[in-house]
Structures are given as C-alpha cells and as structure tokens.
Amino acid sequence: MAASFAGTATVVSADSGDDNTLTVWAWDQNFNIKSMQMAGEQYAKDHEGFSVDIIETSSDDCQTKLTTAANAGDYSTLPDIVLMQDNSYQKYLKSYPDAFTDLKDMDVNWDDFGKLKQSYSMVDDTHYGVPFDNGAVIACYRTDILEEAGYTLDDLTDITWSKFMEIGKDLHEKTGKYLLTSEATGGDTLMMMMQSCGANFVNEDGEAYIVGNDVAEKCINLYVDLVKNDVVKLVNNWDEYIATITGGEAAGIVNGNWITATLMATEDQKGLWQITTMPKVDDVDTATNYANNGGSSWYITSNCKNVELAEDFLASTFGSSTDFYDAILPVSGAISCYLPAGESEVYNEPNEFFNGQSIFSTIVEYSSHIPEFTKTPYHYEARECVNTAVVNIVNGTAKEDALQEAQDTLAFKMTE
C-alpha cells in the first residue's frame, strides 16, 4: 500500500523519480506511518513541492526485501528511507553495509538523544540512523491492588528485585494475585534485567556468553525465584499476557513504554494505574533501574538519489524539532526519545488514565539513564535460549544443564 503526503506523486516503485520526493518504507498506519506523514507535512511548509511517498511495509518485509536486494547485488529496489527495529538493525548493517548511507555529515546534535538509543544505529562511532520512538522500560502497577495488600507506588520505586520479591510474595498471600506477568519463551523480562546492568548474553566479541557470565546467572537465579515464589506468573503467549493484566490477575507489568497503549484501552481501569522505575538487580555494581525494550529508527539507504535532502528532512523533524514531537504525540501516540521534547508543555500534561501522572516527560527522562551494553545480531535467538532455560529449570532441570544447553544452542544458532 502506498500513500503520498504533502504532494501528489504516485508511487510505482521504490524510486519516485522526483528529486523533491522521498520514498519511505514503514509499518503501522496509526503510529509510524502517521508520524512520517506529519513529518512530511511539517517539512513541506518551508520546502515548497516536497513530499514523502510512504509504502506500507511490515517490519518483516522490510528485512526480507533488504536481504533479497543484497543477495541480488541490486539495491535499486530500496526506498530512500527505511524504518527498522532497533534490536534487528545491527544484524543487517553488519551483513549488508553497502545498503545504508552513513550520517557523518548530518546536522544533528546527537547528545540530544540517550546514549543507548544512539548506539543501536551506530558502528565504529559512526551514526547510520535517526532515532525515532522511545523504548524506555517502565513498571506499571495497579494501585488499587497494591493498596489492598498495604503498599503504595513509593514502595515499588527505585527498589531492587529482592525487595520486589518480598513485596510480591506478601501481595500474593494477601490477594492471590501476582505482582508481575511474563511470557514464558517469548517474554523480555530477563533481557530487560540484563540490559539494566549494561550486560548481555554475548561477550564483547559477540560470542555466546551464558555459562560463566556472573550477571547472567544472577538474573536467571532471580527470575527463577520470582516464578517459583508466585511473584511472576509465566504465561504461554501474548494474548494470555495481556489477559492477566487487563483481567486483574497481575498487579504489575514491566515492559517497554509502548505497553501504555494496551493499558489505556481498558477504560474501566482509568486512574488505577501508575508508572515508575523497574527494579534493579541486587549485588551488581553496574545495575540500574533503567532498561530499553523496543523502538525503531530511520535509515537512509544507498539507493537514495538525494541524500542531502533526506538528511535535512530527517534532521529538521525527527532529529531536532520539539514542535514536531509535540504534534505527533496526541495523534500517533509516538513518544519521543529526543530528550528536549520531554521538557515541553505537551509532554508534561497530566494523564488522567495514569492518575494525573505526567508519564510522557517521565518516560523521556528514563531514556536518558539507560546503560549501554554489547549488542548482538542474535538478540531474539538469545532471548529464546535463556527463556527456554528458565522454563526448564522451573520444571526441574538442573540449572547447570539448562544453562549449558542454552549456551550451546545459542552458539549453534550463531553459525546458521
């Protein structure tokens, strides 16, 4: 599906054939595409004749088409600009470096973005992407359930996971509810724990690093204990995950801030939810109460015929405009990772659903504290391996055996 904005050009291929039009691949009509549409409209106000032609392309299709073009040695099918998920981009940049244009000459103050967000789209200190949506992790709690057990949001702010477990066990005994829910093999809780310590399940050389990784073992031990002590409810899939939250079976959720859209769809729970920081891992010097889960960035491909225009467009909108981020927030729900945006009046408006909290400015502020960590092109493979290990340990497998299997499986997947 193609959509032309701020102009009348019609997309017939990835090449618009118009020096003043940029083609874009992106997904999600109401979020990413709407934001790009509004960016095009804003830029066109000062650049007569400018337009963006947006071709709706799923995230998977963006990756598949990029791979197909690279394998054919022909990048002419690529658009000028493509949206890519932060957790997958490194894999494609390292595999197909000729597919992208570096942003060495772009006029952007990169310090206006959190260091972790920048690092997703960097290689060897060179920027390749303009950060877009914010993936900062938040902890959300049903304050009515907390109060039923005798707790407030302050009791769960800036705490450790051991304190979280203490509260969670008490809450379960008093209410029968869980303090947290997580998907068994597809969940991100363990990955967020690791990232909050500035760590990962790979070493600096990109090799599988689970066995012998002290931080990994601490996180896995914590996570297993949380499950075994009825603090975390493991569920089988996303639908069950959402059902435990909206149905009131779990009093809390730790995830990327995009989860707020799901919570806000439950109108009958308006005013009952509030957000705060996630717990941090005990006895790890680098541990913090901040992590990232999700997010994406915009990239200029090597097929772009007018790189100067593409750079100026992205720099003038996504790269520097608080007015732009103020405009898209109420329309698309896209929360900025551009730090100055968090200081605006729009971002500081109280949110009724979250009991009057100014959640958007808070989320932007959280994103500035997230530690950097070693990236891997095999993020999702690592997630599957360690989550499977946790399930196996909970079901009775010896921890050493489960972790060794996870290590071996991840190492094998890295060779495929």
Language-model features, listed with the residues they occupy:
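Short, low-complexity disordered leader/linker segments with a strong preference
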Residues: 1-23, 45, 404, 408-416
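Hinge/lid segment of periplasmic solute-binding proteins
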Residues: 83-138, 162-167, 192, 197, ...
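Extracytoplasmic/periplasmic solute-binding protein
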Residues: 126-132, 137, 147, 162-209, ...
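Glycine-centered hinge/linker elements that transmit conformational signals in sensory
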Residues: 166-170, 206-235, 278
